[in-house]
Amino acid sequence: VSWTKADIAFETIQQRQLVAKLMKSVKLFEGLSGDEALELLAQAEKSVFAAGDYIIQEGERGAFMYVIIAGKVEITKWVNGSYEKPLAEFGAGDSFGEMALVDNLERSASAKALTGCTLLRLSDQEFRLIPAIGAKIYRNIACLLSQRLRNTNAMISLLMAETDDAAA
């Protein structure tokens, strides 16, 4: 189901509240004006998943990402092809799948709905159609991926320290 401008126009208080809530809670939308958010949302596809559904699968190709409107999503990675290891849990306002949007390569991890989820699916096509919005979104994606890389580096440092302590 896709939203149309009529679905999310600033005509009702509820619709204005939705846009305002997204503007405040979704880091990906930081720096967008209300009109820009409305234009982006009009291009986005609304997706609904039941608990346990895979949203994206590690190894598949994708040129889109998701923003969580409601629900919880778990990010997992296969370890040695034998089991899935949880890496992160995301909730409303968070986004995932950005790497494939940026580089159009295979997904590096899977995402599974932990609860029923309502998501916005965004593709690079929306950002190309509206270059001014795309530039802001891609900058926000760069900041988000940078923060995640810093967190990953910190975790690797802790694991290396634990390994060094165990070997001593």
Can you describe what each PLM-predicted range is?
Residues V1-A168:
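Cytosolic regulatory regions built on CNB/CRP/Popeye-like sensor folds
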